[in-house]
């Protein structure tokens, strides 16, 4: 069993460069199946989710060349075949293959997706959109087959999303890119990652308008071609490092940051009294003095990102006073709370809210990452704590944070990965 060992209490200093966005690249790679030519992605993060997606593409007959942060994918050999269930079941973003395979072949046979257990994240919205576009859904054991009649081309449709959903918005875009006719998505999610996927599709020859707004229109085309695309910076990784720098840093510059993707998060930090300087593509976080507590309520973009409430929680424990966190998107995103309490934090879940009292001096302890962003919170807590922290279940962390051990070591952290 692999684990991360941290000897905490050391102030960190230096620079860290944010990698390409995980939540973009896990959709961009499946999107490439729609292309009739080679597609190159630059700025691809070194995370296990990418490794798994590459393996899926190769099993299906595509070819992949990887050179550092550059990924070259030739999808022309991809076959119309059932997906490899092992990798599919471990990876929630595998559902993006539904849309891309539907767009290419008129059907997709896939295992049901895995990923972090954060409470209800149903794919009903995805399936409702596919049905509106002429597909039928069949359950076959642990797999699901989504298909048009006799593999016909999927049809454009007018779709209203009952709930704002990043995954369903992207999946509908993928299916619609080569559909017969126009697709309109109303109540679409507005996240930067959706704009990134739309940019790739348009660079491949698709006709997507309105990405980043509540109404997206896609005029289906018959074919898409190869291109080259730069993945946007990971705003969640950036926010995680910014919160970490405020909690345990004595001067850290976070590079490759797009401020406009983090405005609601930065506003909360400013309300706490965090001292930082925003530059064109970087943020410098100073060593902090006294901090004030704030309340956080997550909401769809451009609101406070649910993916940032856990990485920010250890920083909140440094504030003098009481505050609360309400996650309106994923109700079970509280599994980091008992682990932080194990480290001495005055924090608990009351009535569906996280309530904290600070400031708290954390102590090292054995803890377990229950999901990706909870893992990031525990890493920050371990860096803040007196003594040694041992984090298990670290596969969650490694699937979303590129080179995190190396990056933190370069900042002066006493952190290492142990292979038991």
From Swiss-Prot:
PANTHER family documented for this protein: UDP-N-ACETYLGLUCOSAMINE 1-CARBOXYVINYLTRANSFERASE, UDP-N-ACETYLGLUCOSAMINE 1-CARBOXYVINYLTRANSFERASE 2
Instruction: Tell me the route in metabolism or biology where this protein functions.
Output: Cell wall biogenesis; peptidoglycan biosynthesis
Predominant location: cytoplasm
What's in the keyword line of the UniProt record? Answer: Cell cycle, Cell division, Cell shape, Cell wall biogenesis/degradation, Cytoplasm, Peptidoglycan synthesis, Pyruvate, Transferase
What the protein does? Cell wall formation. Adds enolpyruvyl to UDP-N-acetylglucosamine.
Specify the species. Answer: Streptococcus thermophilus (strain CNRZ 1066)
NCBIfam families cross-referenced by the UniProt entry = murA, PRK09369.1, PRK12830.1
Please report the name of this protein according to its UniProt entry: UDP-N-acetylglucosamine 1-carboxyvinyltransferase 2
Q: Report the transmembrane regions from the record.
A: none
State one Pfam family annotation.
EPSP_synthase
Top-level class of the enzyme under EC nomenclature: transferase
Listed Gene3D superfamilies: Enolpyruvate transferase domain
Entry's Gene Ontology BP terms: cell division; cell wall organization; peptidoglycan biosynthetic process; regulation of cell shape; UDP-N-acetylgalactosamine biosynthetic process
PTM annotation (2-(S-cysteinyl)pyruvic acid O-phosphothioketal): residues:
116
Enzyme Commission designation:
2.5.1.7
Q: Which residues bind UDP-N-acetyl-alpha-D-glucosamine?
A: 92, 121-125, 307, 329
> To which protein family does this belong?
Belongs to the EPSP synthase family. MurA subfamily.
Q: Which InterPro entries match?
A: Enolpyruvate_Tfrase_dom, Enolpyruvate_Tfrase_sf, MurA_subfamily, RNA3'P_cycl/enolpyr_Trfase_a/b, UDP_GlcNAc_COvinyl_MurA
Q: Where does phosphoenolpyruvate bind?
A: 22-23
What GO MF terms are annotated?
UDP-N-acetylglucosamine 1-carboxyvinyltransferase activity
Q: GO CC annotation: what is one? A: cytoplasm
Active-site residues, as the UniProt record annotates them: 116 (proton donor)
Q: Which reaction does it catalyse?
A: phosphoenolpyruvate + UDP-N-acetyl-alpha-D-glucosamine = UDP-N-acetyl-3-O-(1-carboxyvinyl)-alpha-D-glucosamine + phosphate
**Highest taxon above the source species:** Bacteria
CDD domains registered for this protein in UniProt: UdpNAET
> Where is this gene product found?
Cytoplasm
